[in-house]
Amino acid sequence: MFCNQCEQTTRGDVCHQWGACGKSPEVDALQDLLVHCLRGLSQVALQAKSLGLATRETDEFTCEMLFSTLTNVNFSTSDFISFVNRAIALRESLKLQIQATGNAVIQSAINSFQPASDTQKQIQQGKDLEFEFISQSAKNVDIFSLKLTLLYGLKGVAAYAFHALELNQHDESLYIFFHEVLANLDAQDKSLQDWLDLTLKVGQMNLKAMELLDAGNTETFGHPTPTTVPLGHTVGKAILVSGHDLLALKAVLEQTSGTGIKVYTHGELLPAHGYPKLKQTHPHLYGHYGTAWQNQTHEFERFPGAIVMTTNCLMPPHETYKDKVFTLGPVGYPGLQHISIHDISLVIQKALELPGFTEDSEQKTVTTGFARNAVLGVADTVINAVKQGDIRHFFLVGGCDGAKPGRNYYSDLVEKIPNDCVVLTLGCGKFRFFDQNLGDIGGIPRLLDLGQCNDAYSAIQIAVALANTFEVNVNQLPLSMILSWYEQKAIAVLLTLLYLGIQNIRIGPTLPAFLTPNVVKLLSETFHLQLITTPEQDLAVCLG
């Protein structure tokens, strides 16, 4: 087993025996086998596109399958065997369509590959392909490092593109890019600079994917508005929806209407409360329960209702509560019931069987919904506060949360940020400090929750708008970005910021294990990318 795509990789190096996320060596091998089959499918898809053939099914499948290989999404060997078979079926179907046009299929070893019919042999094929991919770059570990960065970033882009296509937002250039990267991942004629340029293009494409998702979310659910969200609970039957999928949450809300069941969000679905067409249309969307993904084992155990897991981040469930957890979309785990977004009757049945909350709890609240439209709507107030010296500096403190030590840096940092500074946050990293009362500056809250990790798009739009107003570039704004990372979507977001030329980003709690010292040096020299140190030291530099 070789997996170093997340921040929690064993000993900060690579997972060899078992994934720190709970992924088995068998699933790891089948994920590598799936990616190999997708590479062959992409080669054929590109030829099909060049002939004007329709490839939308393949495009969408490629996005969803890359998404399924993200950290904490799918742990099911049977699912990945099914995915591999589907990839081959789509590939062969496209080949027949190409031949029907009178053209010969451009054959290669990758697009002629056939998976074994036996599960154990497929697992061995995956292990062999993993070793072959590593061996191809053995002579240049820096190129291998950038290849991994490219692939992991692409997985993050695929996650956002998948959510966007669910909302009927598509972009052909995005699909072509997926196929081009996968089809040429084994290229041996590219320099280190070539691979760096391609990696930064992942950032460019991720900006497009986040833009599509932003359009899909706002057109479907309205622009987020500042909304107070209760963190407590109320008496009654309950369903908890975790993950990131707003469309799945909408389906749960629609199908539970009139049942008396209250729906609660968990993890990165907290920002859902800010979308008018979710909150205002569905009054039984009651509040938010729990915190970030890594706390789910004890939070899910205590929740007295049914739980729906959408997209990532699923942890291996404990036996004590796995019978009330349901998976949806690309999420999978052996022994958990998988449901369709169109029929959640099993979830409703389970929620009605379980006791639900038997008493009301204390109603502490937080506020979410400060996306780009809300913030830019009060831009004049913000600008005047900066000009008058009431706001000295902005800090974007966000990203992924995680379980490894060192992440208390972010809560300590926010506590120490001076009172004349505003904190923007997004992603599940905010759960380190989301319930702190930081007060306001002239009516502007000092803590602004922009939304989910993909709402980095909002942060970018806000920064660009402020830069245009002050007639400077983004790097000249009184703005510091201090980010936490865990998985592949965070990699994609970081690559977007680097593609945009944003300098002096601080990341933590550790550097990605897949970055070699030379690649770290290259990124540091080019973009002044740096690792966090201590809250005191970093604040002194940012405000100096």
UniProtKB/Swiss-Prot annotation:
Function per UniProt: Catalyzes the reduction of hydroxylamine to form NH(3) and H(2)O.
Biological process annotations from GO: response to hydrogen peroxide
Annotated EC: 1.7.99.1
Names of the cofactor(s): [4Fe-4S] cluster; hybrid [4Fe-2O-2S] cluster
Catalytic activity: A + NH4(+) + H2O = hydroxylamine + AH2 + H(+)
Group of enzyme by EC: oxidoreductase
KW Iron-sulfur (keyword) present: yes
Cysteine persulfide carried by residues: C400
Gene: hcp
Residues binding [4Fe-4S] cluster, per UniProt: C3, C6, C15, C21
GO cellular component, one term: cytoplasm
Family according to the record: Belongs to the HCP family.
Any matching Pfam family: Prismane
Species this chain originates from: Trichormus variabilis (strain ATCC 29413 / PCC 7937) (Anabaena variabilis)
Superkingdom, taxonomy of origin: Bacteria
UniProt-annotated location(s): Cytoplasm
Binding site for hybrid [4Fe-2O-2S] cluster: H244, E268, C313, C400, C428, C453, E487, K489
Protein name: Hydroxylamine reductase
GO molecular function, one term: peroxidase activity
Keywords in alphabetical order: 4Fe-4S, Cytoplasm, Iron, Iron-sulfur, Metal-binding, Oxidoreductase
Cofactor detail note: Binds 1 [4Fe-4S] cluster.
